[in-house]
Design a protein with these regions (language model features):
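Class II aminoacyl-tRNA synthetase catalytic cores and aaRS-like
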Residues: 1-178
Length: 178
């Protein structure tokens, strides 16, 4: 709120499902006698509010995706979705840095945390690197500088990343390595 954001509460039940290509959970609204869908994203509702003139909106809420489940993917999860008019990627990066830094300070009394044996400093601003530069810095491999997609896939494999798509581009290899 200190930065002029308005918290919204988009509907959890939708008809039709929208905002992502994920499969929704389906329920039935008895009074209206129609199928309804638990939301898979809040994106469209929040973007409609931006188009309608609200310049800074967010929601912290539950999403539901009727898809696979494993230790990294739960069908029900909480997200924060933030939209802001009249900014660009750098403005959103600044916002996220401030959010992480302030939350860490409020919760821990410091902007430093220990995670998996590492000391992480969440003091803004953070280091900003293009993906290829980050991968090059941490692996010594230049995915965009290699000669072909095939070579990029070989580098990924050498670094322990097996690409499911055997025709993946160097961009896909870079994304998986990142």
């Amino acid at each position: 709120a200190s930065q002029g954001f308005m918290e919204l509460a988009p509907p959890v039940l939708n008809s039709p499902a929208s905002g992502s290509s994920a499969r929704p959970f389906i329920t039935h609204h008895n009074t209206l006698d129609i199928d309804m869908y638990l939301r898979i994203a809040t994106e469209l509702h929040l973007k409609m509010c931006i188009v309608g003139g609200l310049e800074r909106v967010y929601e912290i809420g539950r999403l539901f995706r009727n898809e696979g489940m494993d230790p990294m993917h739960n069908p029900e999860f909480t997200t924060i979705e933030i939209y802001q008019a009249y900014t660009d990627l750098r403005g959103m990066m600044d916002l996220c840095e401030t959010l992480f830094s302030r939350c860490c300070q409020l919760v821990n009394g410091t902007t430093r945390i220990q995670y998996q044996g590492m000391d992480i400093d969440l003091t803004a601003p953070f280091a900003r690197l293009p993906m290829n530069e980050a991968v090059k810095q941490y692996t010594g491999k230049d995915i965009y500088g290699c000669g072909s997609d095939e070579e990029a896939r070989a580098i990924a494999k050498e670094l322990g990343v097996e690409l499911k798509d055997k025709t993946a581009s160097n961009g896909k290899a870079l994304a998986e390595l990142f």
